[in-house]
């Protein structure tokens, strides 16, 4: 094989509630593919409803990797993801199958496709404890404000309430004196490791997306989200990442009897809409995304055609 040959990889990206899972399955059916999930929460076992995890029925028998691999008390970083996804890509390609990335965690998708090399610096002794103490004393908003001043680019990619990632970014900055974005630039290889097609799903009218998000939340509640969220709340000290996740933390005031269920539900819908906006901002800044109208009757056919053309160029 030509030494310059690069494995083809297809990615399906976009904000929440745009039909990424279904499109990924359709592509896998037509092009003999296997799916690698690019969702930072779907890796956790037992967090099924709040993460909109793909169901066995929805997979239609297509292998889905990177789902249900850790218990919620375990940490999982973008460096962990790129290592896992790199190994999966090799295995899938060796089986003569097409690797299809599906998910809305932009940092995961971009880091993998761009071949970012992560080096895990060891934090100075006591730094993590110091940051945790500062968080307890000052609050999350103050810590996020510090990150905005130190590393605006990293802050823009992190939700203010995601205290785990805020502290991790601050830890990196204080330990190395460098921004995360600087590390990322230094760790980029001279050329990308894969030949990729990135399909982005979105709706031309924002109101359509927001209605779909609201409907999805209602369906999650019907499916038993409250019970799942209560389990996270009861284990919030050990389920650190899950306790910060959209879909769970919005209901904590309800369990603490400080807010009615209706108010918490509305808060979740608003948080999900805001998250969709941040996802769109991220993916709009990525190079080479081929955007598709998720609501168009021929959206799947267009995606199949684009993928067929992409593979034919190989």
Residue ranges and their predicted role:
Residues 1-314:
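Phosphate/pyrophosphate-binding catalytic cores of soluble transferases and nucleic-acid-acting enzymes
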């Amino acid at each position: 094989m030509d030494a310059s040959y690069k494995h083809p990889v297809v990615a399906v990206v976009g904000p929440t509630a745009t039909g990424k899972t279904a499109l990924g399955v359709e592509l896998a059916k037509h092009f003999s593919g296997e799916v690698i999930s690019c969702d930072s929460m779907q890796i956790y076992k037992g967090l099924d409803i709040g993460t909109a995890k793909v169901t066995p029925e929805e997979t239609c028998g297509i292998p889905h990797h990177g789902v249900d691999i850790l218990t919620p008390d375990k940490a999982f970083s973008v460096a962990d993801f790129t290592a896992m996804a790199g190994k999966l890509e090799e295995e899938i390609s060796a089986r003569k199958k097409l690797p299809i990335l599906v998910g809305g965690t932009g940092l995961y998708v971009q880091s993998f496709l761009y071949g970012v090399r992560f080096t895990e610096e060891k934090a100075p002794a006591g730094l993590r404890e110091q940051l945790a103490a500062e968080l307890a004393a000052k609050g999350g908003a103050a810590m996020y404000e510090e990150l905005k001043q130190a590393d605006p680019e990293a802050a823009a990619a992190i939700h203010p309430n995601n205290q785990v990632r805020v502290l991790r970014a601050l830890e990196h900055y204080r330990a190395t004196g460098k921004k995360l974005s600087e590390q990322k630039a230094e760790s980029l290889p001279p050329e990308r490791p894969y030949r990729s097609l990135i399909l982005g799903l979105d709706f031309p009218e924002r109101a359509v997306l927001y209605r779909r998000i609201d409907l999805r939340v209602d369906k999650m509640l019907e499916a038993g989200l409250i019970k799942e969220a209560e389990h996270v709340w009861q284990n919030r000290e050990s389920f650190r990442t899950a306790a910060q996740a959209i879909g769970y933390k919005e209901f904590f005031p309800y369990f603490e009897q400080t807010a009615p269920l209706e108010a918490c539900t509305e808060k979740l819908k608003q948080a999900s809409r805001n998250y969709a906006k941040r996802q769109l901002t991220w993916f709009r800044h990525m190079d080479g995304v081929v955007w598709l109208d998720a609501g168009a009757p021929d959206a799947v056919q267009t995606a199949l055609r684009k993928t067929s053309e992409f593979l034919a160029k190989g």
